[in-house]
Every structure is written in structure tokens, then in C-alpha cells.
């Protein structure tokens, strides 16, 4: 898959860095993957772009904000790298951003989450195509999952809309709640493939990679740098909600 190319510079983006705020993981590949993703966002936006983490992975938001302030930034946009409006998006992110702003003196603006909109449907379809998954294959859309029913419902709705685009069955499954990947795979007709709703490697993804290998099911990679245009879009939308002058 090709990497993002620089877009014509939007006058709103001048001197306003972007921070991608992810949950974090003990998986050793997370930091490098998110740094690569944010580098791609920086290429699109033409501004400094950094990854920060809520937990388990360094650096945290306060550290990244302090570094940007030391480099002369006065404000930054924080894009939560989350697909659903669950606990992390509604509680953790606002609290972390408030603490980071107070500690660094940086004006931090929270952008919309990545969500499960039509641009995410298009991204998933593109990822499936790039992974060589045939259009007629049914898909397991694998997400982290949440204790919040509405968040899981949003992923089920995303799967339903992806099914319309593909004209082949798509079912959602989760790493932390029902239905499990195996339960969904048992319901899907063959041929079947697995499509992770993950930006990077993760401990919750590793067992599904093993299931795919043992069962002979193709599995697409994490979304990675292909998600950069969506993050860039959330960044630009956030900037357009405030007066930067």
C-alpha cells in the first residue's frame, strides 16, 4: 500500500502540531507502529505529528505536550485514536488532555475520535482489497470490544455497512466480550477472512492471528499508515472549530 503524499498546505494548520492519543499496550510493536502512523499524518498535514499513550506505552501525553511547548508550540490538536465512544473516549481522554494541558502550558484541543463512519468503511474495504481478500469472501471484523453496549453496537453497525459495500457477509467479534472470534467464524460461510479493527499490533490481536494461522483463514494486517488520512481529517475538522488568530 502506498504511503501518504504531502497535501497542499491548509492555512489553518500553520504551527499547530497534531498528537495521536492511543490507549497503549504491553505489546512491543505498538510504539513503533503508532510512531510510523503519526509520521504519515505529519507528512499529510505538514506539521509536527507525535504519538502519545493513555497507559502501558511511553510517552504519555504530558511528556509529548511538554516537548512541543519546549519547541515553541502554543497549542496542539489531540486526535483520540479510538473507534468507539466508550470509557476511554468519554472519560480517560478528557481527563488526560486536561492534565497534559495544565502540566505543559500548551493549549490542547480535542478532536473527534476516528469513529465508525463511512470513511472507516472505505478504509476497511481498501485494506481487505490490499490484503488480497477476494470480494466474495465473508469477513470477520475483529475489534477490542467494550463493556458499553452502545460502543459494541457501533461496531456491529460498521460490520453491517461494510457488508453492504462488499455484498458478502460481515460479522463483528470482540477480544473482550461476546461474540468471540471463534463464535463468529463458526457462523460465517466459507471462504472467510479476518479483518482487524486495530491500528497496530496488540496483545488482543495475537490470539486471532494464531486462530487464522491454525484455521487457514487469511487475515489482513492492522490498519497502520493507511489510517493517516482519517486522522488528518479529524485534525483539520478540529482546527476549523476554533479561531486560531
Which stretches of residues belong to each language-model region?
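Active-site-proximal alpha-helix that buttresses catalytic centers in soluble enzyme cores
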Residues: 1-245
Amino acid at each position: 500500500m502506498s504511503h501518504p503524499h504531502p497535501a497542499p498546505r491548509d492555512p489553518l494548520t500553520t504551527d499547530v502540531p497534531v498528537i495521536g492519543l492511543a490507549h497503549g499496550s504491553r505489546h512491543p510493536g505498538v510504539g513503533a507502529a503508532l510512531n510510523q502512523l503519526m509520521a504519515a499524518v505529519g507528512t499529510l498535514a505538514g506539521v509536527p505529528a507525535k504519538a502519545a499513550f493513555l497507559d502501558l506505552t511511553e510517552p504519555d501525553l504530558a511528556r509529548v505536550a511538554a516537548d512541543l511547548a519546549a519547541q515553541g508550540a502554543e497549542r496542539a490538536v489531540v486526535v483520540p485514536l479510538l473507534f468507539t465512544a466508550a470509557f476511554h473516549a468519554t472519560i480517560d481522554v478528557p481527563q488526560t488532555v486536561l492534565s497534559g494541558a495544565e502540566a505543559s502550558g500548551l493549549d490542547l484541543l480535542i478532536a473527534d475520535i476516528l469513529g465508525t463512519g463511512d470513511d472507516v468503511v472505505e478504509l476497511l474495504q481498501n485494506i481487505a482489497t490490499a490484503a488480497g481478500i477476494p470480494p466474495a469472501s465473508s469477513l470477520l471484523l475483529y475489534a477490542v470490544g467494550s463493556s458499553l453496549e452502545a460502543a459494541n453496537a457501533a461496531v456491529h453497525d460498521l460490520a453491517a455497512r461494510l457488508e453492504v459495500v462488499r455484498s458478502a457477509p460481515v460479522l463483528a467479534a470482540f477480544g473482550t466480550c461476546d461474540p468471540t472470534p471463534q463464535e463468529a467464524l463458526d457462523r460465517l460461510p466459507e471462504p472467510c477472512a479476518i479483518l482487524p479493527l486495530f491500528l497496530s499490533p496488540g496483545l488482543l490481536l495475537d490470539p486471532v492471528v494464531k486462530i487464522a494461522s491454525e484455521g487457514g483463514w487469511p487475515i489482513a494486517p492492522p490498519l497502520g499508515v493507511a489510517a493517516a488520512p482519517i486522522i488528518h481529517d479529524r485534525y483539520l475538522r478540529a482546527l476549523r472549530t476554533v479561531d486560531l488568530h
